[in-house]
Amino acid sequence: MGAHLVRRYLGDASVEPDPLQMPTFPPDYGFPERKEREMVATQQEMMDAQLRLQLRDYCAHYLIRLLKCKRDSFPNFLACKQERHDWDYCEHRDYVMRMKEFERERRLLQRKKRREKKAAELAKGQGPGEVDPKVAL
């Protein structure tokens, strides 16, 4: 998990996205029929369940079900294993999706930098395979 932090400090920081900032590329870039992620739990449901701000993510509806199950079957804490599993699995999928988005952003930044470098070389007249006239003489 810390590899992106090491690459930021030891590698080229211009092609490493900041994990605390929003992505710079649109989410449907390269995926025209990609659907936008939507929250299942509404703001009112999360307020009614008194969820902390850190827990209000795309898996909040599973957490609300888990907390309700724990409340309803209080002494029997093992009764909510399926709800706990559903919430953990949703958190895992969310984490994997965020890591894929981070990697996608990193690759798009690298591609953008390569294209800018290639355009700058072509503007100077020194593209790949071309020889500078001074060197040719």
Curated annotation (Swiss-Prot):
Limits of the CHCH domain: 56-98
Pfam families reported for this sequence: NDUF_B7 (PF05676)
Lipidated residues (N-myristoyl glycine): 2
PTM sites of type Phosphoserine: 73
Keyword field: Disulfide bond, Electron transport, Lipoprotein, Membrane, Mitochondrion, Mitochondrion inner membrane, Myristate, Phosphoprotein, Respiratory chain, Transport
InterPro entries attached to this UniProt entry: NDUB7
Motif mapping: Cx9C motif 1: 59-69
Motif Cx9C motif 2 positions after renumbering to this chain: 80-90
GO molecular function: NADH dehydrogenase (ubiquinone) activity
GO cellular component: mitochondrial inner membrane; mitochondrial intermembrane space; respiratory chain complex I
Subcellular location: Mitochondrion inner membrane; Mitochondrion intermembrane space
Membrane topology listed for this record: Peripheral membrane protein
Region (Disordered) location: 113-137
S-S bridge residues: 59-90, 69-80
Family: Belongs to the complex I NDUFB7 subunit family.
Annotated function: Accessory subunit of the mitochondrial membrane respiratory chain NADH dehydrogenase (Complex I), that is believed not to be involved in catalysis. Complex I functions in the transfer of electrons from NADH to the respiratory chain. The immediate electron acceptor for the enzyme is believed to be ubiquinone.
Quaternary structure and partners: Complex I is composed of 45 different subunits.
Comment text on domains: Contains two C-X9-C motifs that are predicted to form a helix-coil-helix structure, permitting the formation of intramolecular disulfide bonds.
Protein name in UniProt: NADH dehydrogenase [ubiquinone] 1 beta subcomplex subunit 7
Naturally occurring in which organism (per UniProt): Pongo pygmaeus (Bornean orangutan)
Primary gene name: NDUFB7
